[in-house]
């Protein structure tokens, strides 16, 4: 048997916590495709099985799960047992989010990391800290699906939407093409009705400025389509008049939107897209034209 991994030996601290008989992985007599683990990880999992078997919730058990997570952050059984330890010994919870902060950058797109944060936050209730943490993560990757999902989960569970408009303003100021920020803005303003310090008129002015600044930004046009769906065409008349005045008549994103905004003219607009504006995709626009006037 290989000598025990030095880091693992220090974590297990047999002098302090007593002996522990490892339980090796049982792959059967003739495994078809045995996975080749590192020695430290294989030994760690053997001791982890032993700790689970005896239902040990000690500090060494917690540290062992940390060792295993650093070697395999997707091992949901280890994460689940780590939470059992924390739930059993609440005094360990105080440092858990700090530990998660340290590993977040390395494993920022790992599902288990974010699910574990949700479970810890359900115990600590300190959601303000986590909202600030997500902002720091956006500085690393402002389009990280996992971070956005976690932030939405926080909003839904703690019902504090007061920072969201400011957050999307800041992110779109840095990157007007940030589709994640546009999606989040639409969600909090038009899907939740939780943000009170805004008006549709102000939002349409904001949107007008963003579209005129970057007329080919599909994210902003998609946002406008959502506003049309939620508010109806009559609320957008002034905005559309302004866009028509300031954008070329054959501007492709404008024409695509006008086909939805003015259904009675959609057949003509799609024909214009097919024949003049976007000839390489003429087949699509011809089909859209036929579909608009069955």
Curated annotation (Swiss-Prot):
Top class in the EC scheme: transferase
Its Gene Ontology cellular component terms are: CAAX-protein geranylgeranyltransferase complex; cytoplasm; nucleus; protein farnesyltransferase complex
Its catalytic activity? Answer: L-cysteinyl-[protein] + (2E,6E)-farnesyl diphosphate = S-(2E,6E)-farnesyl-L-cysteinyl-[protein] + diphosphate; geranylgeranyl diphosphate + L-cysteinyl-[protein] = S-geranylgeranyl-L-cysteinyl-[protein] + diphosphate
Output the Pfam families linked to this UniProt entry.
PPTA
Q: Which domain of life is it from?
A: Eukaryota
EC identifiers of the protein: 2.5.1.58, 2.5.1.59
**Chain positions of PFTA repeats:** 57-91, 92-125, 126-160, 161-194, 199-233
Q: Name the InterPro entries for this protein.
A: Prenyl_trans_a
The alphabetical list of record keywords is: Magnesium, Prenyltransferase, Repeat, Transferase
Which cofactors go with this protein? Mg(2+)
GO terms, biological process: peptide pheromone maturation; protein farnesylation; protein geranylgeranylation; protein localization to plasma membrane
Q: Per its record, what are the GO molecular function terms?
A: CAAX-protein geranylgeranyltransferase activity; protein farnesyltransferase activity; Rab geranylgeranyltransferase activity
Show the PANTHER family listed in the entry.
PROTEIN FARNESYLTRANSFERASE ALPHA SUBUNIT/RAB GERANYLGERANYL TRANSFERASE ALPHA SUBUNIT, PROTEIN FARNESYLTRANSFERASE_GERANYLGERANYLTRANSFERASE TYPE-1 SUBUNIT ALPHA
* Known partners and oligomeric status: Heterodimer of an alpha(cwp1) and a beta(cpp1 or cwg2) subunit.
Protein role: Catalyzes the transfer of a farnesyl or geranyl-geranyl moiety from farnesyl or geranyl-geranyl diphosphate to a cysteine at the fourth position from the C-terminus of several proteins having the C-terminal sequence Cys-aliphatic-aliphatic-X. The alpha(cwp1) subunit is thought to participate in a stable complex with the substrate. The beta(cpp1 or cwg2) subunits bind the peptide substrate.
Family the entry assigns = Belongs to the protein prenyltransferase subunit alpha family.
What this protein is called in its record is Protein farnesyltransferase/geranylgeranyltransferase type-1 subunit alpha
**Which species expresses this protein natively?**
Schizosaccharomyces pombe (strain 972 / ATCC 24843)
């Amino acid at each position: 048997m290989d000598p025990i991994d030095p880091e693992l030996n220090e974590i297990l601290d047999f002098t302090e916590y007593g002996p522990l008989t490892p339980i090796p992985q049982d792959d059967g007599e003739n495994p078809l495709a045995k996975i080749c683990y590192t020695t430290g990880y294989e030994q760690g999992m053997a001791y982890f099985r032993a700790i689970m078997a005896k239902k040990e919730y000690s500090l060494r058990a917690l540290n062992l799960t940390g060792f295993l997570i650093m070697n395999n952050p997707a091992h949901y059984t280890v994460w689940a047992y780590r939470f059992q330890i924390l739930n059993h010994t609440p005094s360990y919870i105080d440092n858990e989010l700090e530990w998660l902060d340290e590993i977040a950058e390395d494993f920022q797109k790992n599902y288990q990391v974010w699910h574990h944060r949700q479970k810890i936050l359900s115990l600590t209730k300190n959601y303000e800290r986590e909202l600030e943490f997500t902002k720091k993560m956006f500085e690393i990757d402002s389009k990280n699906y996992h971070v956005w999902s976690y932030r939405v989960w926080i909003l839904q569970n703690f019902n504090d939407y007061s920072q969201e408009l400011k957050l999307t303003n800041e992110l779109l100021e840095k990157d007007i093409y940030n589709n994640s920020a546009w999606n989040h803005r639409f969600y909090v303003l038009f899907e939740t009705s939780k943000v009170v310090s805004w008006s549709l008129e102000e939002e349409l002015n904001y949107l007008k400025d963003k579209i005129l600044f970057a007329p080919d930004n599909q994210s902003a046009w998609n946002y406008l389509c959502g506003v049309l769906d939620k508010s109806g065409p009559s609320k957008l008349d002034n905005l559309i008049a302004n866009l028509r005045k300031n954008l070329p008549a054959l501007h492709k994103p404008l024409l695509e939107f006008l086909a939805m905004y003015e259904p009675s003219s959609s057949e003509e607009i799609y024909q214009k897209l097919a024949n003049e504006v976007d000839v390489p995709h003429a087949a699509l626009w011809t089909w859209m034209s036929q579909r608009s006037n069955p």
